[in-house]
Regions:
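Residue-level detector of functionally pivotal "anchor" positions at catalytic/ligand-binding pockets or at interdomain
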Residues: 33, 328-362, 368, 409
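Boundary/entry segment of secreted carbohydrate-active catalytic domains
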Residues: 34-68
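Acidic-and-aromatic substrate-binding clefts and catalytic sites of carbohydrate-active enzymes
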Residues: 44-55, 71-84, 111, 151-155, ...
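Substrate-binding cleft and catalytic face of glycoside hydrolase catalytic domains
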Residues: 58-76, 84-199, 262
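Aromatic-rich peripheral "rim/lid" segments of glycoside hydrolase catalytic domains that contact
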Residues: 75-76, 145, 149-167, 180, ...
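Glycoside hydrolase catalytic-domain groove-lining segments
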Residues: 77, 82-99, 167-190, 204-266, ...
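C-terminal tail/sorting-segment detector
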Residues: 334-338, 351, 376, 390-412
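Short, glycine-anchored, charge-dense loop/turn motifs used at functional sites
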Residues: 366-374, 396
Length: 412
């Protein structure tokens, strides 16, 4: 299976003319030296009570919404979608050139209660509408938790029979929802996400069995997300051994919701040193998302890393220093986390630049969000590159129609 790039620039081409949009960002946010900036693995976190703090970019180069994108949060009332929270996350990721993950599409916990009153055919219609709405609004999202916590004693969705149920493979409904997601997001990294799958034996074994079946049946699943909420309670060697078991299925691993529920600073730092070092140096792990970082504003006591006033707990100070000093850990799936500035299309292209306020024919030009043309020059080289000149801080859009192809390099 080809693993797609996590990229801000996603272009799907056919023989027909295709309209595309790419973003070039000169951030107006405070400029911080992110620990993982330029590293071959991402270091992420989540929103803080549906907001994004001004110090976010100081520590993290990947973002996940804690609750904003869950189906229940978006469509609490049938056919009334509330996207404001997810819009903020998508905008922030684009403006700052960091990857974001949509969390999550299907989960048997936080889904709209009105789904329980529908027939299976109606449930399938609503699932399809949910995916269609999200895909139309966020076609460029880099990663998606397609299914969350479907281990039998966790929270498999009660509407799974609308997707085919267990079926002949034992996982028919999962294969179907991944296929439906791939049809709408051809370039996103599609993830199965669950907890206890690197901690406790029976759940590790189930995850291995499930992943093996998904691989055998050519599912569209790209990666396994391991939440790792309880990993801090387990010996690091045991955790690593369980990760090795999952990795043997052939899927990349994302540590998706790690936290350390330890109020003692020294103990939290010790665990962080042991376990994060193992995560970062494991060749099958492509990135780590820590689940919350502000003391007193995380879902579990003791997991925070930064006091509200900005004082770092020792574990965070160590983490920042370690990642900065180790930007190129082993990674067997570097393309999964690469965020290139290249925008690739087919060779020998003529472009028409489209804006609300200007239409310009030519190789490419850059517009701000108000549709005003920004200065640029075209270098006479292959692949071509456009260099913004005298551009103020802000987010810029490159809109163009592909006629026959070419490769553009966008510099931010």
């Amino acid at each position: 299976m080809n693993i797609p790039y996590i990229s801000r620039y996603k272009i799907n081409l056919s023989s027909a003319v295709v309209s595309c949009a790419a973003f070039v960002c000169m951030s107006a946010y405070p400029v911080f030296s992110q620990p993982a900036k330029g590293a071959n693995k991402f270091l992420g976190n989540i929103t803080v009570m549906s907001s994004i703090r001004s110090d976010y970019l100081k520590y993290w180069n990947q973002i996940t919404g804690e609750n904003e994108s869950k189906w229940e949060s978006v469509e609490r009332t049938r056919d009334k979608m509330s996207w404001a929270g997810t819009d903020r996350i998508a905008k922030y990721s684009r403006e700052n050139g960091i990857a974001w993950k949509f969390h999550c599409l299907v989960w048997g916990s936080q889904y709209p209660g009105w789904m329980n009153n529908l027939s299976q055919s109606e449930q399938l219609e609503e699932i399809t509408e949910w995916l269609d709405s999200a895909a139309a609004r966020y076609p460029d999202v880099q990663m998606i938790d397609v299914i969350n916590e479907a281990y039998p004693s966790h929270k498999p969705p009660p509407f799974k029979n609308a997707l085919g149920g267990d079926g002949s493979t034992g996982y028919d409904w999962m294969i179907k929802i991944f296929k439906m997601t791939r049809d709408r997001w051809p370039n996103a990294v599609l993830i199965y996400n669950d907890y206890n799958t690197i901690e406790w034996g029976s759940e590790v074994d189930w995850q291995v069995k499930m992943a093996t079946a998904m691989k055998k049946n050519n599912s569209e699943m790209d990666a396994i997300g391991v939440q790792a909420h309880d990993a801090w309670k387990v010996a690091t060697n045991t955790v690593k051994g369980n990760i090795d078991k999952l990795a043997a299925t052939g899927y990349p691993i994302i540590v998706s919701e790690y936290d350390i529920g330890e109020s003692n600073d020294s103990r939290q730092k010790q665990i962080m040193e042991e376990q994060f070092t193992m995560f970062w140096n494991h060749p099958k792990i492509v990135g780590v998302t820590y689940w919350g970082y502000i003391v007193g504003r995380t879902w579990r006591n003791g997991t925070g890393l930064l006091n509200d006033g900005g004082a770092e707990r020792p574990a965070l100070t160590w983490l920042v220093d370690f990642v900065k000093k180790n930007p190129n850990p082993p990674n067997d799936y570097p393309k999964l986390v690469k965020m290139p500035d290249d925008v690739s299309v087919a060779p020998h292209t003529t472009y028409t630049i489209i804006s609300k306020k200007a239409d310009v024919s030519g190789p490419m030009q850059i517009f701000n969000l108000q549709g005003r043309l920004s200065s640029s020059r075209l270098e006479n080289s292959q692949p071509m590159s456009v260099v913004p000149v005298n551009s103020a801080h802000g987010c810029y859009i490159i809109n163009y129609k592909d006629m026959q192809g070419g490769t553009i390099k966008s510099l931010r």
